[in-house]
Amino acid sequence: MIKALFQIFGVIGVVLLLGCSDNSGSGNSDSLVNPESDETKSQRMRELLSDSVSYMYELSLIRGHLWVAKRLSMTGFLDHAAMHAKHPEDEIYSDLVEVFKAKGLRGFALELSAFSNSVVSGDQKAIEQDYRVLVDSVQVSQDLVELTTGELLELINRLISQAAREYAVGIIDGQVDNVHEYQDARGFIEIAMNLTRNHEQQSDLSENHLAVIGLLKGSLEGLLEMWPTLVPLGEVPFDASRLFGAAADVEILSLSL
């Protein structure tokens, strides 16, 4: 029945986009235009401390950028990789510094800087090593949080929605207009898949929740064809509307929990 519900409502995904979760996360370009007031920063910190989904969303954005940086560096696209390696340090991590302190965590600023420097240097052995250390450090910050299936779906909805916005900027009429945004979107879907697979391994999930997670995993895997390569040279015959629809489908899936 859940599968049927998913298939029936998938076609109205774009219409339901307006119902998707509002995201004020660091992936939005608006935050680069309007400097945050002290009160806004204080509210943001309270949100990240009290809302597990918002906290995990920020960490997931970082993980997405880092995954792309690692992939690009391993295939020789060091200039592209360096941009993604620096992005979390420059634009996202600062939101989390005080949150980590409040949670009693050391964070991963040193590891983030080391990985970024390794990417710039082009030393593949150092890149591999520093990436593993960095991912392990990020995982320590994630391990404090255990999401319910409903919270996971909300998080995945946010990640797909952000990927859709980035893809819409990156690919216009089948042509690459901003390869960096296109690459960002791929990283966010990768982390969404990773989170979904990890959640599926929980031993206490009900049959209903396992069915929902299975459908979610299949949907995410189906999206991967939208990135035939991380640095496309020709046409990319896909459109962001597919991602917007996938985000809406996740909302519909959550109704069956």
Predicted regions and their residues:
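Bacterial N-terminal signal peptides that target proteins for export
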Residues: 1-9
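Hydrophobic helical h-region of N-terminal Sec-dependent signal peptides
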Residues: 10-14
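Mature extracytoplasmic or organellar-lumen-exposed domains after removal of signal/transit peptides
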Residues: 24-257
